[in-house]
């Protein structure tokens, strides 16, 4: 029988703050090592593409950002559902803290895609199905951020953001399968679970390292933001006051 103790413990802001403090350094170090390794390998040592030459190297930023942008939104939807069903405050904190990170990753994916598209397609932007769906994803992130800031009541804001996150998740399969459902300029998926990558190993391995690095970076950034938000929300409790006092004394 599965042990759900950890899930119930997540409902405790104090427990989350303590356990996340142990995870944070590991994610931060892993992110730094993986991103530096992937960048140096991919940008300096990976062979050029036989068609696109060195312009393809932007893939080492574009693909990880696009992966993370979509994964982050799925996480928002899951956290939103947990918050609505189990009334778990940490889930609401996760939604509020992850949305800006996801928005930035979506923006980076769109920006690098535009830079890559100029030499490849001859245009900075085309109303391609996948590009349009990614733009909608950015607006969904903006909507969640705006709702969280516009609604003064914290519980009402959490519910509104959760509903938007859950409804908007329908856009994720559209992004993923748009290249299969419609005729698009965008290339098929770089990685699939069932098929070996078409590019040689010296090109896709640094890309995989970058993807893992971006996920570790996301985890580290999310934990930092959530820990600060938890301290803010629990500022009247004894444990939060003690933690803030310890942090202030440590900073001196």
Swiss-Prot record:
The chain crosses the membrane at residues 26-46, 66-86, 97-117, 131-151, 162-182, 204-224. It is a multi-pass membrane protein. GO terms for molecular function: catalase activity; heme binding; heme transmembrane transporter activity. It holds the Pfam family Cytochrom_C_asm. Keywords: Cell inner membrane, Cell membrane, Cytochrome c-type biogenesis, Membrane, Transmembrane, Transmembrane helix, Transport. GO terms for biological process: bacterial-type flagellum-dependent swarming motility; bacterial-type flagellum-dependent swimming motility; cytochrome complex assembly; glycolipid biosynthetic process; pyoverdine biosynthetic process; type IV pilus-dependent motility. One of its GO terms (cellular component) is plasma membrane. InterPro entries: Cyt_c_assembly, Cyt_c_biogenesis_CcmC, Cyt_c_biogenesis_CcsA/CcmC. It comes from the Bacteria. It is found in: Cell inner membrane. Its main location: membrane. The keyword Cell membrane applies. Required for the export of heme to the periplasm for the biogenesis of c-type cytochromes. Belongs to the CcmC/CycZ/HelC family. This is Heme exporter protein C. It comes from Pseudomonas aeruginosa (strain ATCC 15692 / DSM 22644 / CIP 104116 / JCM 14847 / LMG 12228 / 1C / PRS 101 / PAO1). The lineage of its organism: Bacteria, Pseudomonadati, Pseudomonadota, Gammaproteobacteria, Pseudomonadales. The gene is ccmC.
